[in-house]
A protein has these predicted regions:
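A glycine/threonine-rich phosphate-anchoring loop and its flanking beta-alpha core
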Residues: 7, 109-158
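ATP/NTP phosphate-donor binding region
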Residues: 1-88
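Short secondary-structure transition/capping segments
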Residues: 80-85, 105-117
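Gly/Ser/Thr-rich helix-start
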Residues: 13, 36, 94-96, 139-141, ...
Length: 158
């Protein structure tokens, strides 16, 4: 078995501002995925929006990610992203927004698939670009290709 997960990690003060050009280079319209409050309260959302605005990139926020994100939430966010025509995804927050963003990126790149694709398929090879802006430490979601989601229909996580 072989894995290739191209990941860049920047750990520095004002990393979003310092790397704004790279952040803006992933597409023309970003879906910013967050929880309800913290990304706005801690200033991370404002930093990301300013970086995208500086390079003329459009962006829209989906702030409905709950703790232990569900497949249902991912599908709602996917529909929101489709309606807006986004072409890359940015997650701001802890493991929940980051995991949700990865799943949303998979579903946006595979519009013909339904929710079961997220937990019935062994591997996903197609996704929109994802940028993660972690605001907590400990989950490691920013450096993996894995997303943990709650599957209410099966009363489990996948």
């Amino acid at each position: 078995m072989k894995y290739y997960i191209p990941t860049k990690v920047y750990q520095e003060i004002d990393a979003v501002k310092v790397h704004a050009e790279e952040l803006a280079g992933y597409g023309s319209y970003a879906l910013i995925v967050t929880g309800k409050y913290s990304a706005r309260a801690n200033g991370a959302l404002a930093d990301v929006e300013a970086a995208l605005d500086a390079y003329g990139k459009k962006h829209v926020q989906y702030d409905g990610i709950e703790e232990n994100p569900s497949v249902e939430t991912v599908m709602k966010a996917t529909e929101f992203g489709k309606r807006n025509g986004v072409d890359f995804v940015i997650a701001i927050g802890g493991g929940s927004p980051m995991d949700a963003a990865k799943a949303i990126a998979i579903m946006l790149a595979n519009p013909e698939k339904d929710a079961e694709y997220l937990y019935e398929s062994a591997a996903h090879t197609k996704a929109l670009p994802v940028v993660t802006i972690p605001t907590t430490c400990g989950t490691g979601s920013e450096v993996t290709g894995v997303a943990v989601l709650t599957v209410h229909a099966k009363r489990t996580k996948a």
